[in-house]
Amino acid sequence: MSDIVEKTLTALPGLFLQNQPGGGPAAAKASFSSRLGSLVRGITALTSKHEEEKLIQQELSSLKATVSAPTTTLKMMKECMVRLIYCEMLGYDASFGYIHAIKLAQQGNLLEKRVGYLAVSLFLHESHELLLLLVNTVVKDLQSTNLVEVCMALTVVSQIFPCEMIPAVLPLIEDKLQHSKEIVRRKAVLALYKFHLIAPNQVQHIHIKFRKALCDRDVGVMAASLHIYLRMIKENSSGYKDLTGSFVTILKQVVGGKLPVEFNYHSVPAPWLQIQLLRILGLLGKDDQRTSELMYDVLDESLRRAELNHNVTYAILFECVHTVYSIYPKSELLEKAAKCIGKFVLSPKINLKYLGLKALTYVIQQDPTLALQHQMTIIECLDHPDPIIKRETLELLYRITNAQNITVIVQKMLEYLHQSKEEYVIVNLVGKIAELAEKYAPDNAWFIQTMNAVFSVGGDVMHPDIPNNFLRLLAEGFDDETEDQQLRLYAVQSYLTLLDMENVFYPQRFLQVMSWVLGEYSYLLDKETPEEVIAKLYKLLMNDSVSSETKAWLIAAVTKLTSQAHSSNTVERLIHEFTISLDTCMRQHAFELKHLHENVELMKSLLPVDRSCEDLVVDASLSFLDGFVAEGLSQGAAPYKPPHQRQEEKLSQEKVLNFEPYGLSFSSSGFTGRQSPAGISLGSDVSGNSAETGLKETNSLKLEGIKKLWGKEGYLPKKESKTGDESGALPVPQESIMENVDQAITKKDQSQVLTQSKEEKEKQLLASSLFVGLGSESTINLLGKADTVSHKFRRKSKVKEAKSGETTSTHNMTCSSFSSLSNVAYEDDYYSNTLHDTGDKELKKFSLTSELLDSESLTELPLVEKFSYCSLSTPSLFANNNMEIFHPPQSTAASVAKESSLASSFLEETTEYIHSNAMEVCNNETISVSSYKIWKDDCLLMVWSVTNKSGLELKSADLEIFPAENFKVTEQPGCCLPVMEAESTKSFQYSVQIEKPFTEGNLTGFISYHMMDTHSAQLEFSVNLSLLDFIRPLKISSDDFGKLWLSFANDVKQNVKMSESQAALPSALKTLQQKLRLHIIEIIGNEGLLACQLLPSIPCLLHCRVHADVLALWFRSSCSTLPDYLLYQCQKVMEGS
């Protein structure tokens, strides 16, 4: 922005306070605050809405008199306009001031114009008739030499100008694209963007100028042009492929920090500009390999650089992932994007978890197996307290549904549907359930029961296409006629059972579906006669809670059944009661039924059995009525008018006053959206108002799915619910509709779950049911032990998924202690866990099959316990949980040297054990605390080194370690030093043992001290611990391996691709031994046996087999979490080496 513009905008606030009556700025300020301020203070002091309305009406009356007075000056008008704006903001009508706002924008000076334009943009809308009076003012200001006037005119044009006024200002705005000031060019581009939104045809001739704006020397102008290009590329991406290089170049400059600093947001370079460019690239590269290759490098760079812990960087990462999966795929980018999604999903922050689920929902279409890595996290999200997380999780499950997990996913959707009260959620989920049921239904019974639940819960708010599609499916059937008949018969039996239930209320659309099905297919029944079905339908017809439209469906069903019944007193009674009905529609149907009932042969020919899906030959020209039409015209009947002609006449008469009294309404048909089957089957040949019906359908409001509240009879719900309240209708019980859905949970052997908590077993089984069918089908049979678990609703005895990470039902067994681990050289950097306060940006992801663990006690006693979610520390997105970037302070060389010397001396004493590097966990100008780990045979030894960096003594230095839920600190919980000498270092040791299996946890604490007996300070720190810190090698023989293998029930399998450096099995096993502390028991040909233990004595066994360049891993343990965790670590090791 130029200096002139900055000075002008800086001076604007002062203009509000100058040239006011009273002689100076102080008086002006007092005048302004005394009127507007007193109004605000008066309103805030009120205690009721009535008092507020009374005060505002008094103020509006005063303002109306003031603005209408001829003696009111423009300065006074400006102040009145500000008060009018405030009253309008509170919701009160101030339309008398609209014309004065336009006058103020036309006549005032710079400040008064600004207030006038502001009031106009807030008061008027695009269709307001007074807006026409503003056109000349805007044209004049666009031609002004004053920069601020031009900007104000461009702003109001982009806010409220309709498409009819575009030609008056378009040439002037085009000229402003060449203006010397960048702020004018930017506002001109935004105004053209508004024109493109409301009237794209009027700006097609200036597309070449949009390209010039894209290449503008000012970043703001270029950024404004991206709005236009994003919309145009959405409409036609092929026409802008040649600009891909330009967009890539711009994104490279933005990511590389080449833009001015004022475009940065929290040290992130132009984040919103990056997001728009990523969206544009995603549209351009879709299904285009050549174009996508141009953007691979910049997308890789964007993923790499977006590492700051800030919300806006998460938004950039999300858009990067979206773009990577939108363009032509590249394996390296897909892997990085998948890791990024994992960090989002596993984040404890709700917003980031939602972003992860949103991204996972999108990319799951390209890679369904990606959900397997986060299956237990998804299970946890199903019970998340945040409804948005729940809803997005259900959307994710909807995307991964297949024929094998359909029953469990639909059950979860129905459970959420019963709990939800939001209409939008109900409509959305009901549509998804109906779609899945039709696509993947395992059998007829499940399909009918599921659709019954959909109709019951969805009620009358569901989209009308859902029941229509269901009825069409029943009518058209499949290729197998026998299966079609079975489906129809089950539907009829199900509906008769539901109708037998007493005091149950069914939605109107559900009743309509029942009536149609019973009318069409009741002939399939063996035990029930048509007379019995008619009696049940008649009972519904006499229920006052049934709407008129539903009664039309019911009487149509009765009409069809009457042709099949021999004789029925119920039909005679129905005809007698409804031929005198006040409802004209029902009276018409009753008379039709009466005449057809008198001629049985005619009824059977008109209503044949099972002919609902037959194709009918329709004479669209209605040529058979030519004689009837000629006769009517000869007798003076009005000629036919096309729908458009009648619509024009109707519109021309809308504003004409009606001086005739309204006619009395004899009855109401009650039809609002869908025509009844009776009207289709019985009245199609005799209807005389087909043209009017077509006009209503095409030119009237579409009210399908909208509850009708008012009609000619008055308030409809009130009348329809008169008897409903008396009858005490109850909702449909879920057991009667979905009696078999709960069978989707697989049965397990009771002996295997004696020591496992019920909730954890349900989660494990739910995971295996939800994510079945997503991986490749392969498995390995080890030591002659075959899988025996069967699944009731699956068509195969067992679906073996190599990549699904399924876990079988588990049982805990008492394990004896084994020999201690061997001394193996491990890589320190692999085990040095990220600390919370160090600002480390290494991203970590733990994709575990289970995060809630059931295991035996660390003593040798069995333990049946449910581990709550809060006991597990889910890894955050960026290793540390805070959102701030840590900048370590400068420490003195002496203190660092002393600390390093002490650490080195202590590590020399423990050279027989593996240890990590020392890492600083917290510091300030006075003190520094570092920590490192020593992996002993029987425990984890944590060492904290405290350094006094100042030249003064510290009094009462106290280092306190808080007890953790999953850990046991065997040493003293804290240590206090009465005096800590200047520039000295002290070291404290704590032995940490695991009490409960976990995925990742924290040891937290603080260091407090006093300086000179007066100043007290405290620093908090946190050290991250993972399960790998408590893994040790387990030395056993091959015979012991075989015995333990057969006794363990928790297993997980996965195929991992080997790199060239790991082509041989020994080298691959050596890598696992070094990285994961596994003990190699034996290598036999292309198979290998390894073992480890979780301290103190929970063993885990690994069987490896090489197939070409694929390493098949099979873990088994008595702990349900350990195999999943080690499998994930093995994948990381094999992919990273």
Curated annotation (Swiss-Prot):
Q: How does it sit in the membrane?
A: Peripheral membrane protein
Please give the residue positions where the record annotates the modification Phosphoserine. 700, 857
Q: How does it assemble?
A: Adaptor protein complex 4 (AP-4) is a heterotetramer composed of two large adaptins (epsilon-type subunit AP4E1 and beta-type subunit AP4B1), a medium adaptin (mu-type subunit AP4M1) and a small adaptin (sigma-type AP4S1). Interacts with TEPSIN. Interacts with GRIA2; probably indirect it mediates the somatodendritic localization of GRIA2 in neurons.
Altering residue 311 to S: what's the impact? In STUT1; uncertain significance
* Name by which UniProt lists this protein: AP-4 complex subunit epsilon-1
Q: What is the lineage of its organism?
A: Eukaryota, Metazoa, Chordata, Craniata, Vertebrata
Q: What is the effect of changing residue 475 to V?
A: In STUT1; uncertain significance
A single Gene Ontology CC annotation of this entry is: endosome lumen
Q: What are the subcellular locations of this protein?
A: Golgi apparatus, trans-Golgi network membrane
Q: Which organism is it from?
A: Homo sapiens
Variant or mutagenesis effect after changing residue 905 to P? In STUT1; uncertain significance
